[in-house]
């Protein structure tokens, strides 16, 4: 019988659909609902050590419309989770007992070698199936920077050498060889070059893309930013359907030029979007923004739609489908 089983960096997934690190994975109740709906994996919202625990101000999210269609894009100035690494550890251990066939991925952000090492140890102790390292959040760069250093120095995803050395630090910290996923940003001049740093550092997989850096705009009546807290705002990240072409471009560049598994994320709203990422070489598909609009149950129609497509096109497995469209992409 045809199924959606696929391996990602050596880890078997019941299906490729994974809840991305986001508000949708930021509580035990939300994770429970996503698992009941049928998601194959969960990336818990990114966490850090207590000294970096944010105090989230609201409002920090807003939808953007285009041609009368609401939430054509989504903009946020959200930060990492307010939950502690201990809470994430507890949830990983708890859900692995209840859902041994699903995959639980801890997402971490750190400032400096000692912090990366401690966070990796914590996630391995909890039994995380994989570790996703957030090195690229466009609105989180200042909140996690090493004291006394420029924020740019805390963003490995923008520099090949820093990416290489940071990834090496993370890999050396492992005691159980838990697969490490490095999350990439599109906000760089040469994505493939920076990604090579992660590969050189020993990363097991890449996740692409993080949100696209931007600014929501100004209310012309008041002069204030459209999304503000007491009149003040900052630069944030754009997600949703509007960024899908950017994500597809980034994922396909990585899968075509590098020999490393890639998780695709960015603008996935239905099975058709997911199929495009798979055809361009992604072995895992993460969803963030669409869940806030359609709910966790959207994964059921995604599974059914993808299975129908595979049957119609004669793909006996997802392995047969992954990367099938890559040969059609050529340089000018």
Regions found by a protein language model. Name each.
Residues 1-104, 110-114, 302:
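N-terminal capping/small domains of soluble enzymes
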Residues 22-27, 110-113, 186-190, 268, ...:
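Short beta->alpha connector loops
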Residues 23, 48, 137, 212, ...:
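Flexible, active-site-proximal loop/turn residues at the rims of small-molecule/cofactor binding pockets
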Residues 32-37, 41, 111-263, 271-285, ...:
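Alpha/beta enzyme core
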Residues 45-46, 266, 288-289:
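Short beta->alpha connector loops at strand-helix junctions that form conserved
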Residues 51-67, 217-235, 278, 290-315:
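C-terminal helical cap(s) of enzyme catalytic domains, especially alpha/beta-barrels
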Residues 64-71, 244, 304-332:
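Extended, intrinsically disordered, low-complexity segments
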